[in-house]
From Swiss-Prot:
Plays an essential role in the repair of DNA double-strand breaks by homologous recombination and in the repair of interstrand DNA cross-links (ICLs) by promoting Fancd2 monoubiquitination by Fancl and participating in recruitment to DNA repair sites. GO terms for cellular component: membrane. Residues 1423-1447 have a biased composition (Basic and acidic residues). The chain crosses the membrane at residues 211-228, 299-315. Belongs to the Fanconi anemia group I protein family. It is a multi-pass membrane protein. It comes from the Eukaryota. GO terms for molecular function: DNA polymerase binding. This is Fanconi anemia group I protein homolog. Residues 1306-1481 are annotated as: Disordered. It is found in: Membrane.
Amino acid sequence: MRSLGEKARFDELELLIQNTPIEKLKETLKSTMTRSEGITYWNYLLRGFNPESKDALAKRFECVRSFMDGLSSTELSYKQTFDLITRLSQDLATFPSEQLAWIVEHCMDGIRQGDAKCVGWKDLLPDALSLLLARPRFLLNGISIDGMEFRDTTVRSIATMQWPASILTPIADMFKTMNLSSGEIVTVLNKFSGALQELSPMELPALCFQLFSMCSTASQLIIPLLALEKYFHRNYYKRLFSDMCSNSTNLDSIDLFSDKELREAEETILHHLNYCTMYKLTEKHLAIMLRNFLHMPDVILTPFMLSAIISMTSINRDPESARISHSILLPFLRNVIKNNEEERTLADYSVWYRDTLQRKQVDLQQVLTVLIDQNKDGKDVITPGLVHLVFYLLKSQSPKMHTLAITFLTKFIRKRFIFGQGIIKLISEWMIVYQEQNQFSECLTLLSVADTYTVSECMKPIQSVLEHMQWLSGEQSMRMMNFILPLLKISNRVRDALIDVLCKAMSSSGIQKRRMAIYGFCMILKQLNNSNAVRQTSSATSFCTQHSISGYSIMTQNTLGSRSNPQRNFDMLTLEIIGMLRNCLQQQFDIRCSLYENLQRAVELNAKLVPHVLQVIDWHFRSFFDTPSAEDAGDDLDTVFRIRYDQLVSSSDDQHMEIQLKDNLGKLIQFVANCLAVFDRAPSGYDTREMNRLMSFCVDRMVANRLPLEEITPPATHLKCALVLQQLNIIEGIICHLLLKSKPQNNAVCQILPLFNQHCKLLESLKALSDASKKAHKQLKQTAKNNSTSTCNLTLNGVPVKTMCTQPDNIWDLAILDKLLHLLLDDVVAFAAPEKTVLLRSNEPLVRYVLSVTASRVESIRLEPDYKQLAYSKRTFKQLTDITKVIYERCIQRLPELWKNFDMQSAALATQCFSECLKTAHETYSKKFEDFVKSFDLASIKGSRNKEVVYTIQDVLDDFMTEYGTDDSICKNEFVSKLPVYLLESLEILLDHIDYQDRAATESYTWLLNFCSKNEILNSEMGLVHRMLFVQRQKTHLGPFFDSVARQLGHVLGVQNEDAPSESVELTLKSISTVTIESCLQHLYAAIQKQLNDVDYFVTKANNLNYKCQVVPEIDQIYWRGNLDSMDRSICTQIIHISRTLLVLTNVCIPLGSLMDGLMKLLIQHYTCLKSLTKHYISSYTSDTSIENIKSTKFELLLRAVGKQLPANIYELITYIEANTLDEEAQQHTKKRKVQAERAKVLRETRLIPKVIMVIEDFNKHIILLSKKTKSKNRLTDYLHLGTMRDFDIKSTDLRAAIERSISDGRNISTEDSNAEDRDEDEDENENVEEDDDAQSTTYPEDLEEKEDECLVIEKKEERRRRRAPSSEAEDPQPKRKRGRKAAEQLEAEDEEQVEEEQPETTLKLRRNKKVEPKTKRSVAIKKPEEQPSHESRTSKRSKGPADKQTAEPAKVDLCVPEVPAEKKKPQPSRRLGIPRTLRK
């Protein structure tokens, strides 16, 4: 056979095979299959059968059967099997259908056997099925069947059989080539999704490649991805997250697979996913599918799923050319992360939210940490996309996103520093471009601190930032400078470049630039003492303390001859910088103050600067005092000592109104006092005796009242006011000096009280000048107005100001205030003798003043500019905690004793100060708030028996309300009434940081409920206790509550329907009264709105969960469907509670205005949420099981509670609004000039009514659609309120055109012969119109089901206008008739003289079909042909009457309407507003 085949003698070959017995052929075939020449024999054997001979075909089929049996029993290599099957496939087209069907059945038997070594069927079965697909009908086992039916049956049979795990990959390869339909692909993928859970990691990549290749759409791709996510979570990530959350790891556990195998499999799968989807699926296709999981962070934010999505982004595939702004998946991931963070926040404040969520929120920090660790091991498949995702988070507007991004980048750069330069370059560019956003500079600063070496190597970005600092604003430059400062410790190049930029800024003409230079130089001075650098030089001096950042700057390299003295480097660099700062002492007022502030901070943090700073500041300080030197002076009492106020402030005009403010001596004294205090710790390097002598002179002369002061008595001038402010700051600076030098051995603190008395006198003088300055300023303006030659300019340093006297600004910083508070409040202090502090502690004005200044200073921390970065300042945090501790321990814990035995105003100021401390810690140090509380409240530490701060405040509030709660005089005091308000604000902040699992959270709610139940509040500002009560209620308790609150509001405000059934009011809150009713109502609105927002979020989440139920394998569908039903039940229960609350609120007589608008907005949001829930049920449940699911999820119960009662109350509420809006008697006497204002008021108070009715009707429409789908006996529409509203938002242009056509037709018809007859017919027709109108309103909703589907018509905004009824219409004493066609025409004729006003914007208009549309001429045109003639005759007669009536009646109406007073009747509700017909008269 081989010889004949090789010589192409095929005729002889056919004859040979024909003459050879079949057994011989089978035996030869079986013996040659395993040999290398087996494919040759098989080829010639198949070639030798004549396809036109039946005997040859039968013999060939026997050989094929033997061949197929041999494949199952003989072990062949994959190449041999593939070659043999491929050769057989070439001749399959010549096989009869019955033989092909046998081959298919044999292949299926091979699949059932599950032998991984015999998988030839995977290549043979698809070809055989494709051939059968085109064949005509054939007999199979005696049954006639066509190819398509056989193919579908075969695929269905394969999909339902049990697949052995060993042949899953060949089966997937077979399905990939079978050209399956979309439904079959989904079925097969679901089958594989359940089967792959049992595979080993080494078997997964090959199978996943086949599955990914099989997917042609994104909705198919998500099926294997969800299965793989489940696989890796169960086998790897679940254990990994458990180990990360626990302190110990179970090293004795034996896992099925190693972590290395799982990670390698995951990495390979991600590579296949990227390759298989690169050209088939775009980001847009994936985003359309993935948006169904937008509100399911637990599905998307897992390590595998996150990696899979990132691997399919264009920015990950081609990071060099792809633009991040064109990405679609990265914004999607950002939104998912945002939703997850919102879920974490919402779960902390809602127990219903936590119970409905049924799981914990995703800890994204853990997920990102895992991805960083995997990336560190060399798994770089998703590195570009992951980094750009973090960039998206950084560029968002959410602070939480910024925190996540900065934390990730900090960890990522530490472990993958090779990517550092690219990251630093991009962020630095964004920092320059987006100057109004602070997150970029903050990120660079934290990166610079976390990995200084990596950032210091990015010289090009640093140089670019330094170049831009020269032309950017000063504040922006200071913000950008913060990330460069940590680099100065290890980089001489950066240091010298920064100094060069600062030198240029110092010589700039702009004040902001020079302030930036001062800030930068002082930051350099502050860091000169740090010594953690080794890289800057190779000499031994690099390890010395003072040589840390100094090195050799550009200006000192030429002056140094030896490097053996590192102290010399420090001194020279310091002197260089201070020498440049010395020039600031001769510059403007703002520059000097900025220098004092920044130098003081540098000195406090680097004490070795003090000798150099004192040398510079000494002569400047002496220049403000006129006194002889210490050698020339005699007795101190007789020595001349005077302050040179002309060096501080001067006037450039005779009237002393244009002043020049040169310096602030008080701030200078405070700065010098701090320098001297630091110098006294190590007094060497400079002679400070003269400075101390001048300070002593200031103290002694001021205490003895012998220091000459400028004239500050009225009449007031601008100069006098400025001098008083200077003297106040001088006294404050002297007090700082006394506090800093005070010791138990000296009498420094004894001199504080006389100085404060002088301070109080100056404040009184300033108040007198302030009163006189207003009159003086007014007189000067009048003089300037009368005399053209004189001018009145009130300027400060050339800048016009509005007032002469401004509020004094205290100069004490937090450190001074801390010492003052300890001095005044503590029994014993380390820096003063106890007997010397008695007078100070008993002085009420001093205590009040210090507490007031402390409160304002602590508040100012929150207002500091971003560049100071106080949120990261440990020093400021320590000072804040110290102040809070002394206030809490000495005032708050003893507050009843304080207001009884000392002063009520001081107690109120103490509570204000404590509240400001908590607010500042809450806003500025939110991450450290727990540490902040532990620093002053020792009871918060475990094991302490003291009472926690929350309970302390509650007890103090109880004491205050018991003693003063009913005292009107105390509660009406403008200042003292703030005491309980400040305590409540403090309690609210503390409760905000208490976890819902903490016992204090539940007990605080109980206390708040008791507080509101037993205390009547006389102060409206204390109404915030209701907000606290409502928030804690939602945080800790489930069930109905707010309906009881709404019922009690009805007792205070009154109700519309007294006969409305109401339950007994179990909850009685005395705190709800006429004083607090408005704030309580607003807080109740906020609570209900939060509940509606939560429900709306969960409706969307339920839609996402429903989609997931459709794509998970069947084995998991029961579990997820159970979760969906549970979520639906929880949603319906919550909406029932909300609806009952709104049912009560709509019956309350709420005042019109913002309170009524708030209720209407709640109703709109409520019905919008109900519509979303109804749409969810429409899409989630099939008609077979829907009614059972609807009953089990309480949706039917919800309709019973909401469907009829709430709309009826809303319509009555609309009547109530109209009755209070349209006051007929007031309109009669309204002047013409107030008409427009009254109309605007009416529109403003009724503008939300059409929207409320629209959402109700929209909800009813969706319930009708759901009722049709369920096809249940108990129709859901039976629970609906039968509204009377139809087409309330009609298309005005069509209506106007129809009316004009009717009028023009009526004028062309003669009315002389049949005027009376036509009138009678017109009246009859009008009655018919009314009857049709009534019938129209009663056909809903039963007849509406038989009508055509509604169509949505989009109108242009310019065309949607509505005419307003004229004022005469409201004043018409005649009863109104229902609007038929005639009334509509008359109304249009009267409205043509009025100004058209735009309707509220509504994009989509509901257009009803024939049975619901108004009877206009346009609707007549669609009648049947046989009905049109008679109808047209009726139309011509009907249009005649209105035309005549319009020509006769206008004069009569114009004359009689203004003079006839309207009778006081019950207001007639307008049908335009959708009032129920049962309310009409």
